[in-house]
């Protein structure tokens, strides 16, 4: 059992106002998951659309199916890490969670509008941290292994993606050096269906779990509200961060898949064609390299950015042709967007938390 530092009066509990507020925040968290799928769908489909293997509509359907299928293949290590590894749970209350979510949502929508492939994952972590610090100061952050891993991943995940994309492309080009480009393209158009599916599964596996972690952290912090419930609300009584309710898993994977179906065409254009021109063989290597890095991180419970990783893989593939094949000016702008994501989302969440606390004190 976890102690919580926020108190609820009997009258407010009795009339259900706080219970309804917590339920509303769960809905907002699932809405963030939808926006994550909408915003980051480009990660999974940019290369397969850029190489014209699938139309945008067919690509998002393909990606959504494999986003959801991650439910059956991966655990919940990332969710547990986000729930317990970053913020002191004794600081968490519904306003902190809602402030963090709204900060991340605002940043995601701004970057989507301007077609910038920033990280939904780091926006969520930054928003969560910003709201907690706004409430309790810097001591709200649990400085330790998970922060080190996540901050390191900001640099290492795109670098690892770039290296994997580069190495796979070199290996594949050597293996197929005696095959005509027409035959190679025909083969990799089919192979890219597999690599795109693998990347979509990796995206769902890592990103949907971040929303699960936020919801479970909220439910554990709010457990006193749901103790003794016998109706449907009994499913919201969670006392341990080690247990992810099935309805939370189903909800998170469903919403990220529906978001992916909605697409994010501005970012698809940026990542699929503007960073570097790709042929099917390049798309296959970028997707496979990016997916392997993300799945490796997911296996060890590290919340990485799928956006960072696949963009790095695309750059690595482009660099095997010649360095000038990569539009480094555009790539540098994307890097700057990555750098400012955590502090920008944190600032927005901090302001949002203060507004919520002023108008809805708990």
PLM segments and residue spans:
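Multi-pass alpha-helical transmembrane bundle typical of ion/small-solute transporters
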Residues: 5-6, 12-362
């Amino acid at each position: 059992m976890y102690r919580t530092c926020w108190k609820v009066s009997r009258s407010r509990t009795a009339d259900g106002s706080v219970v309804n507020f917590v339920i509303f925040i769960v809905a907002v968290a699932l809405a963030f998951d939808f926006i994550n799928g909408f915003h980051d769908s480009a990660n999974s489909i940019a290369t397969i659309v850029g190489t014209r293997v699938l139309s945008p509509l067919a690509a998002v359907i393909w990606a959504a199916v494999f986003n959801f299928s991650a439910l059956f293949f991966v655990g919940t290590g990332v969710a547990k890490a986000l729930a317990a590894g970053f913020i002191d749970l004794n600081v968490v209350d519904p306003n902190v969670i809602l402030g963090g979510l709204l900060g991340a949502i605002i940043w995601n929508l701004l970057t989507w509008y301007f077609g910038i492939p920033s990280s939904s994952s780091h926006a969520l972590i930054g928003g969560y941290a910003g709201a907690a610090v706004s409430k309790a100061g810097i001591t709200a952050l649990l400085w330790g292994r998970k922060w080190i891993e996540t901050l390191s991943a900001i640099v290492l995940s795109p670098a690892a993606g770039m290296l994997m994309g580069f190495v796979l492309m070199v290996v594949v080009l050597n293996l197929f050096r005696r095959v005509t480009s027409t035959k190679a393209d025909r083969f990799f158009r089919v192979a890219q269906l597999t690599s795109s599916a693998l990347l979509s599964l990796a995206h769902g596996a890592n990103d949907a779990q971040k929303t699960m972690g936020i919801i479970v952290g909220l439910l554990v912090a709010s457990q006193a509200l749901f103790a003794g419930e016998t109706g449907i609300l009994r499913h919201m009584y969670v006392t341990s961060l080690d247990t992810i309710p099935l309805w939370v898993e189903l909800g998170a994977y469903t919403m990220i898949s529906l978001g992916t179906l909605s697409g994010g065409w501005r970012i698809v254009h940026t990542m699929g064609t503007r960073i570097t021109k790709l042929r099917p063989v390049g798309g296959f290597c970028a997707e496979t390299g990016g997916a392997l890095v993300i799945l490796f991180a997911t296996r060890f419970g590290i919340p990485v950015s799928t956006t960072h990783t696949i963009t790095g893989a695309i750059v690595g593939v482009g660099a095997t042709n010649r360095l000038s094949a990569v539009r480094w000016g555009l790539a540098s702008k994307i890097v700057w967007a990555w750098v400012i994501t955590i502090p920008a989302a944190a600032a927005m969440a901090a302001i949002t938390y203060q507004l919520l606390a002023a108008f809805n004190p708990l």
